[in-house]
């Protein structure tokens, strides 16, 4: 998946346009993919937010997307 596709999806998740994905934004995006629990969101944040600042940067998102191409293909179909 190309960086342009990662950027497109990232911007869909980053609903307030501040350049990072918060836990609340991640939860809203995951709800579009199906049912999601608060524990699911917490686990995803812990996995993707590698610097531990409580937000997902574009770099963190891209690294996760590159490591999980199958999942990102499914996400791209929805977004």
UniProtKB/Swiss-Prot annotation:
The lineage of its organism: Eukaryota, Viridiplantae, Streptophyta, Embryophyta, Tracheophyta. PANTHER family: EF-HAND CALCIUM-BINDING DOMAIN CONTAINING PROTEIN (PTHR10891). Ca(2+) 2 binds at residues 49, 51, 53, 55, 60. SUPFAM superfamilies: EF-hand (SSF47473). It comes from Brassica campestris. Residues 1-36, 39-71 form the EF-hand domain. This is Polcalcin Bra r 1. Ca(2+) 1 binds at residues 14, 16, 18, 20, 25. GO terms for molecular function: calcium ion binding. The keyword Magnesium does not apply. SMART domains: EFh (SM00054). It holds the Pfam family EF-hand_7. The keyword Nucleus does not apply. Keywords: Allergen, Calcium, Metal-binding, Repeat.
């Amino acid at each position: 998946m190309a960086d342009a596709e990662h950027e497109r999806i990232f911007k869909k998740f980053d609903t307030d346009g501040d350049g990072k994905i918060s836990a609340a934004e991640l939860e809203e995006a995951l709800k579009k993919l199906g049912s999601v629990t608060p524990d699911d969101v917490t686990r995803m944040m812990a996995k993707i937010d590698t610097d531990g600042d409580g937000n997902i940067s574009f770099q963190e998102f891209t690294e996760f997307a590159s490591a999980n191409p199958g999942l990102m293909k499914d996400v791209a179909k929805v977004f």
